[in-house]
């Protein structure tokens, strides 16, 4: 790669990639260009002109997906009743336990989200440095199970009081957050690790059309499938909110506790079927050292051994390229806190908003299921119809998808703001729903709950473009032995979004909610456009960056093989392997 100054790196666009996009519509069968045989590596001309398709998803991906489904079933099944559990009291409507009111409950809800997305850093460090993804997931599953049990016990009516339940809730949130963080940073890289890292190849369809089987599209499809399984698991909110509404909170917490055992079972039974990438020796420390040298000199060539033969670096030039690519990805992630702040409204202020409306017998937190249903319906539509249709005419690359995710998120907030305006205009309590007079204490404003449905649909569509693509981007741009760590950096942006939510929680109260929602919508809209103009040229370097992955084809195989020099000397690891 030619010498590039760091400050100009993200502005340099290789002309051949621009050329590839400009000619993406061409489907020429010009005889003057040689045609590669089926199974062969496509020529530059074929890379520019042939349609790209995905390979089949390996069976081991299904096993990892079951693990994630059960973990997300548990996570969403627990967290959806949290807002009511924290906000209300036993005699309020909707009923609760801790009595923290909307502002306090929203702040604690954001802390819960913040904690769950900070802890992936720790889980990723353990995985990439010592245990590997599989055994890290196993250990943190046990941690998460302990936290759920604490939550269940302290919610039992025979034990529960505001003091006991609050103490138990805080301890449970901390322990569950550690567990889910350790799982979350590793399970998505693990499912993508199951895909063979093979170069693009020519395939002839039954119709006679010659296409390119593109691994990057396979990875994209796997993450869409992964996200689909997440949202099938997230349908647990229907069951847990009904249990909360008709039985009690302890029943809503018991169901996820039991279902989580399914994921642990899939994890154990699939032990010998997973592809397990070897752990790198101090790879995170080496990456930070490499990045520090490059940043201190404002030039990545300063860290390349080929440019400094008199110095001994514990890496090669290709490793520097991977670190550089990972830093590009981290720059893209910098805009995500605004998006996650918007997304977080679904878990707190949307629930509180629904509680101000006429529910007609429904729990106010059950509408979150619409978000999951949206994703379950539209992920296959995008994967099978929308994306292939767009790719027939033009590349539909990561930065473009993320931009549209921001736009859908902004639309969701604006709609919520308009809806809140009409809630305030409806009686009987207008700007202070259920709080204007003792006789209207439990009487909502006269507006139907169904009008909130588009909020969840728009958030769901934004996730397809922003959240799924972010997972894919974090995986494909990370060095091979740092997949979990870079994924945790992406997840950390959610924690920053939650921190912003904590800062804004004092204004999450009536009668300020119209301004809150609309302000978030405008912020997300502006952030999306700034993101687009800042990073749209990254689209043209996708193939170049993805090609760096293929030098590690030998690391992706169905059994775990460790280089003796890379074997971590950790007795916990060996003991766990013996009994897992």
Swiss-Prot record:
Keywords noted in UniProt: Cell membrane, Glycoprotein, Membrane, Peptide transport, Protein transport, Transmembrane, Transmembrane helix, Transport
Glycan attachment points: 101
Free-text disruption phenotype from the record: Leads to a marked reduction in the transport capabilities of di/tripeptides.
Positions with biased composition (Basic and acidic residues): 1-30
Compartment list: Cell membrane
Membrane-spanning residues: 57-78, 107-127, 134-154, 163-183, 219-239, 249-269, 326-346, 370-390, 402-422, 449-469, 484-504, 513-533
Listed InterPro entries: MFS_trans_sf, POT_fam, PTR2_symporter_CS
Region entry Disordered, spans: 1-45
GO terms under cellular component: plasma membrane
GO biological process, one term: oligopeptide transport
GO MF terms held by the record: transmembrane transporter activity
Keyword hit for Nucleotide-binding: no
Membrane topology: Multi-pass membrane protein
Keyword Transmembrane helix annotated: yes
Primary subcellular site in the record, as a coarse category: membrane
Swiss-Prot/TrEMBL catalytic activity: a dipeptide(out) + H(+)(out) = a dipeptide(in) + H(+)(in); an L-amino acid tripeptide(out) + H(+)(out) = an L-amino acid tripeptide(in) + H(+)(in)
Source taxon at top rank: Eukaryota
Described purpose of this protein according to its UniProt entry: Peptide transporter that exploits the inwardly directed proton motive force to facilitate the cellular uptake of di/tripeptides. Shows strong uptake specificity towards the dipeptides Tyr-Phe and Gly-His, when compared to PTR_A and PTR_C.
UniProt family annotation: Belongs to the major facilitator superfamily. Proton-dependent oligopeptide transporter (POT/PTR) (TC 2.A.17) family.
The name this protein goes by in its record: Peptide transporter PTR_B
